[in-house]
Structures are given as C-alpha cells and as structure tokens.
Swiss-Prot record:
It is found in: Secreted, Extracellular space, Extracellular matrix, Basement membrane; Nucleus; Chromosome; Endoplasmic reticulum. InterPro entries: LOX-like_protein, Lysyl_oxidase, Lysyl_oxidase_CS, SRCR, SRCR-like_dom_sf. Ca(2+) binds at residues 551-552, 724, 726, 729-730. The gene is Loxl2. PANTHER family: LYSYL OXIDASE HOMOLOG 2 (PTHR45817:SF1), LYSYL OXIDASE-LIKE-RELATED (PTHR45817). The lysine tyrosylquinone cross-link (LTQ) is generated by condensation of the epsilon-amino group of a lysine with a topaquinone produced by oxidation of tyrosine. This is Lysyl oxidase homolog 2. Cu cation binds at residues 628, 630, 632. It catalyses: L-lysyl-[protein] + O2 + H2O = (S)-2-amino-6-oxohexanoyl-[protein] + H2O2 + NH4(+). The modification 2',4',5'-topaquinone is found at residue 691.
Amino acid sequence: MEIPFGSCLYSCLALLVLLPSLSLAQYESWPYQLQYPEYFQQPPPEHHQHQVPSDVVKIQVRLAGQKRKHNEGRVEVYYEGQWGTVCDDDFSIHAAHVVCREVGYVEAKSWTASSSYGPGEGPIWLDNIYCTGKESTLAACSSNGWGVTDCKHPEDVGVVCSEKRIPGFKFDNSLINQIESLNIQVEDIRIRPILSAFRHRKPVTEGYVEVKEGKAWKQICDKHWTAKNSHVVCGMFGFPAEKTYNPKAYKTFASRRKLRYWKFSMNCTGTEAHISSCKLGPPMFRDPVKNATCENGQPAVVSCVPSQIFSPDGPSRFRKAYKPEQPLVRLRGGAQVGEGRVEVLKNGEWGTVCDDKWDLVSASVVCRELGFGTAKEAVTGSRLGQGIGPIHLNEVQCTGTEKSIIDCKLNTESQGCNHEEDAGVRCNIPIMGFQKKVRLNGGRNPYEGRVEVLTERNGSLVWGNVCGQNWGIVEAMVVCRQLGLGFASNAFQETWYWHGNIFANKVIMSGVKCSGTELSLAHCRHDEEVVCPEGGVQYGAGVACSETAPDLVLNAEIVQQTAYLEDRPMALLQCAMEENCLSASAVHTDPTRGHRRLLRFSSQIHNNGQSDFRPKNGRHAWIWHDCHRHYHSMEVFTYYDLLSLNGTKVAEGHKASFCLEDTECEGDIQKSYECANFGEQGITMGCWDMYRHDIDCQWIDITDVPPGDYLFQVVINPNYEVPESDFSNNIMKCRSRYDGYRIWMYNCHVGGAFSEETEQKFEHFSGLLNNQLSVQ
C-alpha cells in the first residue's frame, strides 16, 4: 500500500517534536526503566491519543474494583454525570485494547468476564459492545446503545492492561465532576527535597509534592491538602507512615521562589494503594485579578517516616523510625526486599493466606504492617512459591485502615483452598540509590556479567571489579537484588570470557562475605584493604540473574513416620565405605563378621519454587561411582546429623545426589527428569524426589552413639551450590530418643515453620509422639 508523502512527513515531524519530551522514570527500580523506542515501532494509531470525533459522545473510562495491580480492574464509564459498568457479552480483546489505550496503557494483555474484580454499582452503560481495536474511545464502538442491556452486575467486564504506558499520555479531565479518579503514572509524581537537611539524604523523606505536566514539574496547592493525601503519597514511595513538619521554613522558601501550581487538587481517603486511585478535588482556578492559583496557600509538603532498615542515618541511629511490633506476619520466597508470600503466625505456627478476594487494599495493610509503603501488586496463584503447613486465612477483605491483617474481615476456614492459591505481595520500598552503585558488564544479556561496583577512592568515585575468590551464590543473590534483577541463578569466580569496562579493570573490593539479607553489596563484610592474589581481570566476580528460582522443602512427616534402626553386616556396606557414608570407626570393624547400626529413614523432597532445581554442574562434570554404577551430579546434596541437645554433633551422614529425578508430581504436571539411561537430572517445580529408606547412604551410622535424647537434623543443599528462593526452609529437625535398642522420632518440623518460642519448646519437650521400634 502506498503512503502519501505528506502523511509520512507529518508523522515524522510529529515524532521529532514528541521525542525530546520523553522523560525516564523517576522510580529507580527495574523494570521501570522504560525503553521508549519500542513504543514507536508500533503503528501510530495504536498508541497516540486521538481527538474524539465530534459526533461521538464524550466519556471517561477508569479501572476500578478489587484490583491486584494498577493496570487492571473493572471497566467503568462516566456518562451523563454518572459512573456505570460494561457488560461482558460480546466483549473482546479488541475492545480491551481500546479501554487500555483510553486510560493510558499501550495495549491490553487480557480481559475478564463475570465480575472478576467484583460487581459494580449504578447503570450498566454498554452491552454487546463491538470494537475493531482501532477506535480512539469506547464510545466509538458499536453497542446496543447507552443503558440498553439485559445484563446484571455479576456480568461486569474487566481488563488487564500492559504495564507499559503511552509516552506523553495526558489525562482528559474535560468532564467536570468531583468523583473522578486521577490517572498519574508513578514516574509523574515526586517528592522534591527543599530544605538543605534533606537534599543529600537517601531516601528522600520530606519535600514538595510535585506532579509532572508536560515538561514541567508543578507544585500542588496545600489549600485542600490533607494528612490522608500525605499518607497515600508516602505509601507510594515506600514509607509506612507520615508525620508533621515545620511549615515556617517552607513558607519562607515559597515566598522567595516563583512557583507553578498544578491546576487540580487531590481528595484521597488515605486507604488507597496509589495516588491514581484517589479522587480529584476541587479545581484550582486562577484568580484573574491577583494572577494567582494558590492565593494564601503554599506548595503541599509531605514528611514521611521510614522503617528502620531504610532510615537515612542507619537502623540504629534513626530514633523516630517506624518500628513494627512483634511480627504476626512475614514475607517468604521473594527476590526483593518487600516482596514475598504472605505468612501469618497463629498459635505459634506459621501458615499462608488463600488468595480468594485478595486485592491491593489488603496487600497494602500487610506492607505497612511490615514497615514498607503500600502494595505495588497483590500477587495470587502462588506466583511467589508455595508455602507449607496450614492455610490460616481466607477471603481477607481489608478496608485499608487496619494496623494488621488480623484486624481485617476474614474467613478462618480454608475449605476449597490449597497452597497453589497462596497469596503474596510486592510492596513499594524507598529509593535508596543502591542500584546505581553496581553494574554488570560483558554479559550476553542484561541479566549477567562481570560485577563492577562504584566506590570512593582518594576523594573520587571510581568503578572497579570485585575479586572472585570465595565468591558464591549468596553474594550473587545480593547483587541481583541490588539491581532489581530477581534471584541469582549462578555465581562465577572466573569471568575471563566476559569483557568488562576497560576503565573498570582494577580490583577495588575483595573478601566479600554476605549473609544474603543485605540491601547492597556494600553492606556485606569485605576486606578493608584489597587482597586478590589472582587479580580481577580474569578472576573477577560475575553473576547471572533470573526472575524465578526453585525452593526445596523436605516432608518432615515422612521422615518421622519412616525412621527405624537396622543392624547391617559390613559385608553389605563396602560401597557405602567407598562413598564415606559410615562413621570413622567403621574402618576398625570386622568386614566379614561385624555390623553397623544405622538410623534409616525416607526423604521426600519437594520443589515448591517457581523454576526447576538443576544440579550446578552439567552432565560432563558428573562423577562416576563404579561401585554403585551411577553418576553423582552433586557430591553433597544433603547432610544428616545427630546432635546433642546443646548442638554438639555426635553422628553424621551425607547423601550425594546420585539420582535427582521426578518421582511424582502434583496434578497434571509432567515429569521432566529421569536418571535412567544417563538422563537429565533435576526436580521439576511442583514435583518431588523420593529417597527411600532402603537405598545406600540413606542413613546415619549411630554405632558409637550412647543411649540418650538427641536432635536429628537434615540439611538440603547445605553448601548453597544451587540457588533457591528461600534457604530458611532447607533445614528439618526432629527430637529423638534412643534407648540402645529402639529409636523414637517426634516433633519433626521444617525450619521456620514455627515461632522461635515454639521451636524452643519442641527442642526441650520430653514427650513422645510415636514409637518406632528397631528392626534388627
């Protein structure tokens, strides 16, 4: 098809005019670094705001209801002074595209029927709607006519839009009403520090609230500003609360500056997760006589209270920092600080929350309770991994004013729920600037590369390498978190195959040792003076990051139910001797007439994460063991220990991963790994690997252990060779009693399944819950 030259010229000129106005996100965290050029590779009619034809009814559209993210919700239309809904009859993805563009998103990802975001109120304005997808407004699509419908609100339609915004999109507020929602992108609002005390602090906790309009940042008049507005703004920027400030200093500053005010005011209830959910307040009309928009007022100021870990002066020195009380809720399985599966403490035991009716408001209550801001996303469908144990809460419905999730309206019955429906959150956290102090170079994609850090040397900021000596997966996890790239999938001690920045080839950090919870690499322990004998160009630390990770969890109940003793002849233990599965005294045992006493049990290891568990080494590096005639893909997959009650090791064992495979899987999940015929090894997410009690090395040699009370402990993936989303649940403990002839195992539980107080009771409780007799 030929394109008229004039049309092309007009489009090109329009593009040249528009490009300079684009601004990158004020929000620092990936993935908000939007790549604007890809927007313009799409057909122009898809992404530009159009003038509505004069013969088309003027409407406004918003996304409402029980939203889990800002870019989704029930479709509501403002027509003839009243908000109403749209019926799902004949609705299509083409209509969803029109809706999403009308509220400022590039396109629709999907649409939902049957009031999945809750039933609306008021009239059902549109039914049997048909769009081609090219319309500039929903009002231009064909339908039964305004208000002509046979639908009820349980048929209200919803949409899920792409997270990508239309560059330069402006909210159309030509319809004057006082219940209109704002439509402000998170990158279009900021807290600008004004007083010198706040200008160079991270995070920014106090300053003017400014909205970007076109190319200019504008202040908001404080005439109609309320503490509820401040509460919402602080929550957006990662702060759990707000406080009062000194208005005198700001009044003096305002009197000396020429200010440009936004023409609208805000009217938040204080329960909103995001400023875009607030209503517009009265318009700020300019006084034509005094030429003033905010007469007798000044710019709105917010002063936010950070939690202790984000306080500008450090956790211990910021006395006024927000301090959460004894936690009754926690997050597990998230890659970033402030995200994870929601778990609640009840009767001393941690349990999960079912995602029925889970939305942004309830998620925000959890986030604030933990010292973060409001929720960016209410995560459903166990997308942050499956929990273990009970499901404590269901159908949580918070109003947004609660101090804790346990204060919300909820159902304590969990019928119909399982761990595939575990709820999670992604919370707003303050911008700390950590992301700008580390980078990856030389990798094949943005998720991998040699680690380069920015540090101060001789009064200047310089980039340099990190020594790869003793660099491991825990340190790599911190780097990936700092960059907002998810979990670490690999840690490299050699990066000679990656060409880093030639101006950053000097080692400036060595001896890095992290616990795994740090916000940045600089918070990890490291050498004061750099010591890296092998150098950093070839042996610089590197990482590969991934958005998902596996999560191995041992079934404690299986261990408790299958434990028993066996006196096994040495003649049957020669292979076990070769693989060091017996205690040291076994070398002195008569190989023909002697025997060893073995504590045997079965292990059922589940992968509850979001990706497959694969050995660190490829099959080319697996080790062949001729005696057992099999390959070991991981020389140490688990540790088995028998400890005294004070924690001293009295007997030990270990299990090499001679065969990591899918024994069984949940539901319709297909097995992917099988050891037969030198097959690939691993554990698929949603599957488990069963190590039966009757296979070699599935034991602890307790021949030399005297009778008494002990702690039995199993540690999976003990050397952190393979990354996981949660290492805290890799430990399982049991109380055990051995009388010289029989063994009892009781109170078996996975690490972190109970409160610390309950854990201590388990370790000192003398009661017996089962009686496993020895088999001799």
